[in-house]
Swiss-Prot record:
This is UvrABC system protein A. One of its GO terms (cellular component) is cytoplasm. The UvrABC repair system catalyzes the recognition and processing of DNA lesions. UvrA is an ATPase and a DNA-binding protein. A damage recognition complex composed of 2 UvrA and 2 UvrB subunits scans DNA for abnormalities. When the presence of a lesion has been verified by UvrB, the UvrA molecules dissociate. Forms a heterotetramer with UvrB during the search for lesions. Belongs to the ABC transporter superfamily. UvrA family. Its main location: cytoplasm.
Length: 940
């Protein structure tokens, strides 16, 4: 096998005919400025070609489901292995996806609980035993005399297929009837054809009996036959009543409860046999929230105190006003009384209605007053009913403004049926086990006391679970729990989970391509991550890691520095070799930082607070230990601490959601805390995260920053536009008129691939230009609107230099290092770091109020050291305007540049959630309890 991967003539995106040789079975780092072409080379060239070759090796039948994969723009690649990409973008937002299911640990857990778990009665909690035939008969004979019953033997339960053989065997056994999918079928008279792809339940009718005192012997024979046929389970179908289930295996005689066979699917919240029926296995329910319906009880009904009625209650001709007027007359209350001062009975009546009563409502329609006798179901019930009945997405979205997620009242968030939760192992059910931290779970399993028989049964299962838990600990995720929803994980956490899963698979000879695995990881945990990456390499794999972390670069076998600049100014190999080679390469910006020629300077002065602050009192969400935290205003404050110490909980779940609820009436519930003081000191809160600036290719930097409005105005003021009567709307690709109607102004056509990701292809009519021919005939300085959208920010700053309104907004994009981005670049093609900097640029271009609080969660994701330097300057500019920046960060260059640090810890998970230190970087660096301080000391 070749010892190198040879890339010849790569031209994907901004790559400039790149030739590169990468050593195989080594740990290789790709680095360079944000937008220099690292991802284009790693993901869009190497990974894409590896995937394409793999797909081409499949049969034509398999390929038809995967679609045609385009060949990357590269002359050739030699020595390429099958490629696996572990990036940060593929986190599942499906509420059914958890850490346990993603890592497949939950599958092994289900098997473990099914094989060695102890079943208990879900009602009384007693450990349940097997039932004898005599016990079953005694229970049946308690039914009233002359009750008609059928003895059924369940043969197939919820399985797909035509089940022809099963039905034939029932007939051969001499049974003439069967209950199929709940319906009794006469097998002699009807030919049964079942749909192959649907799930079916088949139960043979063994006997039909009328309860009498002398049927004991016959009943015993029938039950024994049924038990034999169905492997220990019998169903007594009481005509016109509910079935009674008996099991030779597990039943509580006291409560009369029998449990079906304990199989792995009983513990699956995605299976109809295991999931909680009330919440459908989600653990939460979206319900109308009284606090969102009435956020301010000091307002009266006529003042809009009840939000869903706020727009219609002031219109005296509306139905809402008419019915409320009738209610106020009948129950003697005023619509001008503050809601909080209404009698409890009136308050409840408005929300939950009046049962069994009708009220006389006078309603004006078309100038005529009409009297109705009408029921009133209450606002909460009306909203719930409309939400369930409507097919309108607009209506659903509107009602969802008054809804919030709450724990399911039946399963209390556990997602499973009571029968599943009644099975324990070491005194814990499967949900209680999953709620422990991964480190605690590993300890629990190592201390588990099992009988010799159960040890033999569970030996292999436990090995699989324990090894996977250990891999998660190795990548710094010991603080997570298996019940955590995958959608709530950060990009870095999700990526490291997939990394741990890959180590568990022990593949050899694979090309792994990773996207910044160090994101979200404290310096303390970085060594373990690097050791894990080396372990993956030592198995016999090639690792290409797109990374900016200095420790990772120093640990790599080979570094490829791509640049020298970003976008149009990048796409070349600046340096390639070991650490020493890169450090000695003159043109390498990375090398200059590694060798110390360039560095991020420590601020000469640190700001003092403006004397005002925001204080979070008694924060106790997740692992926070009832802490009080004061955030000084007018400063740049960093929130630090090891992974899982409570940073995101404190800032995103409590501070941001709490302030957003107060300032913007957000429907999101903040995490548990007593109160937030000092809210009057700010007027705006903005969370500048790395989520996309838009969900579709229709959104782009020009539309997001608002610069496109000015550009459209310029085009509408040209002589040609005035002659044709074109207004600014003519140059919008979102409305009819000037856009290409074939692609509705997208420039591309979306092809839905059903169970695969959607595929986008260029529009054949406008050739991707978005506009129709007439619109493109209008030019400003010899450029049409499509050509403007194709310009980079850098080109457009010069192009619009005489129009301050446009130039100033574009200049802020230049200031944040996005000169290489095209104005019309679809948001779907922007990295998280680029999206975040576009949001920062948009904020910089606005007039500062001096009372804005900015929150950023790990803004250095995807940024080179030089980009980080620029980011710090932007944050300092925002704070210089009197605003406040609160930043969650592990990057020591950002931390050393802050005015204040709030350090949480000391550990992650249950051992975290305390404030370890508050102060300047210099003060934190001498705090002996602070891991952050230990690493920070070397930087100051």
């Amino acid at each position: 096998m070749r010892d190198k991967i040879v890339v010849k003539g790569a031209k994907v995106h901004n790559l400039k005919n790149v030739d590169l040789q990468i050593p195989r079975d080594k740990f290789v780092v790709f680095t360079g400025l944000s937008g220099s072409g690292k991802s284009s080379l790693a993901f869009d060239t190497l990974y894409a070609e590896g995937q394409r070759r793999y797909v081409e090796s499949l049969s034509a039948y398999a390929r038809q489901f995967l679609g045609q994969m385009d060949k990357p723009d590269v002359e050739y690649i030699e020595g390429l292995s099958p490629a696996i990409s572990i990036d940060q973008k593929t986190t599942s937002k499906n509420p059914r996806s958890t850490v346990g299911t993603v890592t497949e640990i939950y599958d092994y857990l289900r098997l473990l609980y099914a094989r060695v778990g102890k079943p208990h009665c879900p009602k009384c909690g007693k450990e349940i035993q097997q039932q004898t035939v005599d016990q079953m008969i005694d229970k049946i004979l308690e039914l009233p005399e002359r009750t008609r019953i059928q003895v059924l033997a369940p043969i197939i339960k919820g399985r797909k297929g035509e089940h022809i053989k099963v039905i034939e065997n029932i007939i051969k056994g001499g049974y003439v009837r069967a209950r199929i999918d709940g319906e009794i079928i006469d097998l002699q008279e009807e030919s049964v054809k079942l749909e192959k792809n649907k799930k079916h339940t088949i139960e043979a009718v063994i006997d039909r009996i009328i309860i009498k005192s002398d049927i004991r012997s016959r009943l015993a024979d029938s039950i024994e036959i049924a038990l034999k046929l169905s492997e220990g389970v019998v169903i007594i179908n009481v005509i016109d009543k509910e079935d009674i289930l008996f099991s030779e295996n597990f039943a509580c005689i006291d409560c009369g409860i029998s449990i079906d066979e304990i199989s792995p699917r009983l513990f699956s919240f995605n299976s109809p046999f295991g999931k909680c029926d009330y919440c459908d296995g989600l653990g939460t329910l979206l319900e109308i929230d009284e606090k969102l319906v009435i956020p301010n009880k000091s307002k009266s009904i006529l003042e809009g105190g009840i939000l869903p009625w706020a727009n219609t209650v002031t219109n005296e001709d509306s139905w809402t006003f008419s019915i409320l007027k009738a209610l106020s007359k009948k129950y003697n209350f005023s619509l001008n009384t503050p809601i909080g001062e209404l009698d409890e009975e009136i308050y409840n009546m408005l929300l939950y209605g009046i049962k069994g009563e009708r009220i006389k409502v006078r309603y004006k329609k078309d100038g005529r007053a009409v009297d109705f006798n009408h029921t009133f179901e209450g606002l909460m019930n009306t909203l719930k009913r409309r939400y369930m009945e409507t097919n309108s997405n607009y209506m659903k979205d509107n009602i969802e403004n008054y809804m919030s997620d709450n724990f399911c009242p039946k399963c209390k968030g556990a997602r499973l049926k009571p029968e599943a939760l009644a099975v324990t192992l070491g005194e814990k059910n499967i949900f209680e086990f999953c709620k422990m931290s991964i480190r605690e779970e590993l300890r629990f399993l190592s201390e588990l006391m099992l009988s010799n028989k159960n040890k033999i049964i569970s030996n292999q299962i436990l090995k699989e679970i324990e090894s996977r838990l250990q891999f998660l600990i190795d990548v710094g995720l010991d603080y997570l729990d298996l019940a955590r929803m995958a959608g709530t994980l950060s990009g870095g956490e999700a990526q490291r989970i997939r990394l741990a899963t890959q180590i568990g698979s022990s593949l050899v000879g694979v090309l792994y391509i990773l996207d910044e695995p160090s994101i979200g990881l404290h310096q303390r945990d970085n060594d373990r991550l690097i050791a894990t990456l080396k372990r993956l390499r030592d198995l016999g794999n090639t690792l290409i890691v797109v990374e900016h972390d200095e420790d990772t670069m120093r640990a790599a076998d080979y570094i490829v520095d791509i640049g020298p600049g970003a976008g149009e100014h990048g796409g070349e190999i600046v340096a390639a070799g070991d650490l020493k080679t890169v450090m000695e390469t003159e043109g390498s910006l990375t090398g200059q930082y590694l060798v110390g020629k360039k560095k991020i300077d420590i601020p000469i002065n640190r700001r003092k607070s403006n004397g005002k602050s925001i204080i979070v009192k008694e924060a106790k969400e997740n692992n926070l230990k009832n802490v009080d935290v004061e955030f000084p205003l007018g400063t740049f404050t960093c929130i630090t601490g090891v992974s899982g110490s409570g940073k995101s909980t404190l800032i995103n779940e409590i501070l941001y959601k709490g302030l957003n609820k107060k300032l913007n009436n957000s429907k999101e519930h903040p995490g548990l805390h007593k109160e937030i003081l000092g809210i009057e000191n700010i007027d705006k809160i903005i969370n500048i995260d790395q989520s996309p600036i838009g969900r579709t290719p229709r959104s782009n930097p020009a539309t997001y920053t608002g610069v496109f409005d000015g550009i459209r105005e310029v085009f509408s003021n040209t002589t040609e536009s005035k002659m044709r009567g074109y207004k600014p709307g003519r140059f919008s690709f979102n409305v009819k008129g000037g856009r290409c109607e074939a692609c509705k102004g997208d420039g591309i056509i979306k092809i839905e691939m059903q169970f695969l990701s959607d595929v986008y292809v260029p529009c054949e009519i406008c050739k991707g230009k978005r506009y129709n021919r007439e619109t493109l005939e209008v030019k400003y300085k010899n450029k049409n609107i499509s050509e403007i959208l194709d310009m980079t920010v850098e080109e457009s700053v010069d192009f619009f230099k005489n129009i301050p309104k446009i130039k100033n907004k574009l200049q802020t994009l230049m200031d944040v290092g996005l000169g290489y981005v095209r104005l019309g670049q679809p948001s779907t093609q922007l990295s998280g770091g680029e999206a975040q900097r576009i949001k920062l640029a948009s904020e910089l271009s606005k007039r500062s109020t001096g009372k804005t609080l900015y929150i950023l969660d790990e803004p250095t994701t995807g940024l080179h050291i030089d980009d980080v330097n620029r980011l710090i300057s932007i944050i300092q500019r925002l704070v210089d305007g009197g605003n406040t920046a609160i930043i969650i960060e592990h990057n020591l260059d950002v931390i050393k540049s802050a005015d204040y640090i709030i350090d949480l810890g000391p550990e992650g998970g249950a051992k975290g959630g305390e404030v370890i230190g508050i102060g300047t970087p210099e003060e934190i660096s001498v705090n002996i309890d602070s891991y952050t301080g230990h690493y920070l000391k070397k930087m100051l």
